[in-house]
């Protein structure tokens, strides 16, 4: 293994050790010379350690000089990866080493965007203190404050506002942070933004204000808060609708009712502080109720002059009102009210029934009637038996069975109901927070499962494609090898047959040469007879020129080897040729005796089976060769040389005809064998093709079953 391969292996091991947080292995690999490698997503060991929260590994990598600002395939740095999980210790280490704070990923998000989106307020605080740009926008035009408001992260929103983020900045859709908080019904964030003097009259690209958005989505509490903050209900959006018309269009009757009472809500918000002070005074002026037996005991000792009547209380109240300055002088007014409290609220014990007049009761009733208890008060009144008795009171029976009296306009259930309402609201908020966290976890798990499933599907697709390609190439190689083997076998058969035919032809030629050489020797022996045998030798050609019987006998006497040679040659050729040449062997059997009777028969009788033009020509040549003998006078005797030449030419013609017939039969046999080989090869190819298609179909079915299993 070369040095580069060794370094690459060490780098891969460094990635694994950084991912698992193996500090000792990281130190050893760095000392051995491992360099910074990246994963298939472009992430370095610093990315992996920062995301997994391995602080010691991050510190070692920083000391080793690892680049802080390397971006992966999603353009995220190690700071992004640490911010996503909210690891403040690693964030502190990276910031201390001087990493870039405002690097943007492929969506334009900085590390501050990630911290605000996930609600890691401590991470956001660290980044803001380190000098991160709080006004940076992503590709959608959202700042970090937009993302914090969208996910209802109040603490992150507060930190960003304190860090200098502007609540009136708009994204690409023209929405401010107030639009976003109103859209997602985050009441606490809306209040934070209103306390930060965020404008309630800003419009987005559709011309909607935050009040339009809340009215369209039926967010009653947000609408109420916006109205109390002074939102204008007459602003018209691009569709020509006011917030009231928008609420009616979306069938939100409760919000529409709030918007119709908008002036009353504004007056209520302006006079809320005054009402609180009045309620406080009302509570302090009320007398405490006492048990009925104590009231009965005190009736005899109390005179009518000691009890202030309603006529005396009304002038005192009017004097107190005259002494009160305008609403602008609130401190003096509070001081004067505190001074006048003992005079107004100093009620004595109830007077006897005989001393109470109807007029006094009416005046007291009219005097105390406007002082009703507010429904939305959160104070908890003392038990009814702790009050002093009013002139008008109601009776009730306590837990111990005693008859008690209480103010006629009071309600003991109201503080309990208010307490239950507060507890219910707190429980609802907790449940919402829990649901949000559970939803985030479920979404994260589903995202992980989806990514894992997609990765597995990609791997399976690649494996199936590779397997199919390998099977296809293997089948093609097998087909090619089979075709090549068939071709080689055919060529070998053809070469063997050609060699056999050549050998047979050479044997025939050699036999002919031997026969011709034997005939020439006999001719030479006959051409030099003794003088006493000259007369019979001259008479033999004359006898041969006679009738056909004489020619037959002369031919059998002169050449006894011709028939034997032809018969043996034909027999040997019949044994050497394949069984398909039976017709050729029969033809040779016909031709062999024809060679012995060539002087007696004409050209048409030489090759009757073949019926070729050459046979006709051979007959003509034979006829022409016999004409001189027939036309020659009986007194002339042909020479022995002319007869030998004629016999040799006839033998050559017969041999030529024989070879032509044999070659024609061999060509037919070759063509038939080639056709058989082709048909067999085509059948085998079709069978292999059908087998291959069946195999491919089974593989596709297996792939479909795997996909359905993975999707389930």
UniProtKB/Swiss-Prot annotation:
Matches recorded under InterPro entries: Ankyrin_rpt, Ankyrin_rpt-contain_sf
Subunit text: Interacts with AXN1, AXN2 and CSNK1E/CKI-epsilon.
Residue stretches of each ANK repeat: 9-38, 41-70, 74-103, 107-136, 140-169, 173-202, 206-235, 239-268
Comp. bias regions, Low complexity: 536-556, 626-643
Residue stretches of biased makeup (Basic and acidic residues): 280-296, 316-334
Bias type Polar residues, positions: 298-313, 598-613
Annotated gene: Ankrd6
Pfam families, sorted: Ank, Ank_2, Ank_4
Protein name in UniProt: Ankyrin repeat domain-containing protein 6
A Gene Ontology biological process term: negative regulation of canonical Wnt signaling pathway
Function, as annotated: Recruits CKI-epsilon to the beta-catenin degradation complex that consists of AXN1 or AXN2 and GSK3-beta and allows efficient phosphorylation of beta-catenin, thereby inhibiting beta-catenin/Tcf signals.
Coiled-coil region: 416-445, 669-712
Disordered, as annotated region: 277-382, 521-647
Tagged with keyword Cell inner membrane: no
Disulfide bridges in this chain: none
One cellular component (GO) term of this entry: nucleus
